């Protein structure tokens, strides 16, 4: 996503090509969490889960929920760690030892490290902006395996990381490194993940602009992403790596994506609203719902047929039901905190939001 702690100048040329990082993984539990007062009239409440080692703001971006283990993986960038939250107990395990790098942006120094997570086949893939690498971590033991460069050249660093189960590949959206060629980041980097623990760079897919957000339909072999600048949403065939459709969601401020695979509704975050697109019929815009300003990643629960969209500036979480016609029906608007953005769904109607300013996760619970 568009990092709120630095965008295009967010990587360092620190990695020797082909290097493999071997590190001791330190894991400990943090059980401190408290529930804020429920909002009158709302069916939901928020529980605050503090991240270990966070004494202030933490650069948080892409995080992920592993349905097989019922754990939430949170790359806590500037702490040099990845934090794993147990959904049942809210205990937090910390995987340490990820390299960080210091960059300068707008005259200020910023420390970045791991910033993106994606659930793979028994592993979790971690993108690290601090040293422009992609690492595999065992989903059960939390043991960190091999780390590889995010690209054959040194001009790009990972943004979003996506495991494509249909082809056993990992795709990453990218941003330029500090001093790197901005044009190099206008592509998707593709890795062979047939051996889940040992990624191998495979190819890149050229794009018209920077990719922003993603959603994957493994059933039909389609990958969706937004393109900054032109304001387009693309559908890409995961086997041929060819762009098969381009749609206009009606906004130039495109953020995250979510997908109802069964009904083929694609949801596009557009700054202060979300649109519903008919991905099965030429990308027709079916509906739109206002959320307030400051959207980033959104998510969708296929089981509950609910869309979740956190607006950082409005400090609200919009929860909307999606009908069989692709139209939204507002279910609840839950007050959050300023800066809370990005959401992933857990079991049932549980969801998680990132709160970078306070270095914590907000857990949404139905009363």
Functional labels for PLM-detected ranges:
Residues 1-16:
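N-terminal secretory signal peptides that target proteins for export/translocation
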Residues 19-32:
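Bacterial N-terminal signal peptides
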Residues 34-367:
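Predominantly soluble domains enriched in secretory-pathway, periplasmic, or organellar proteins
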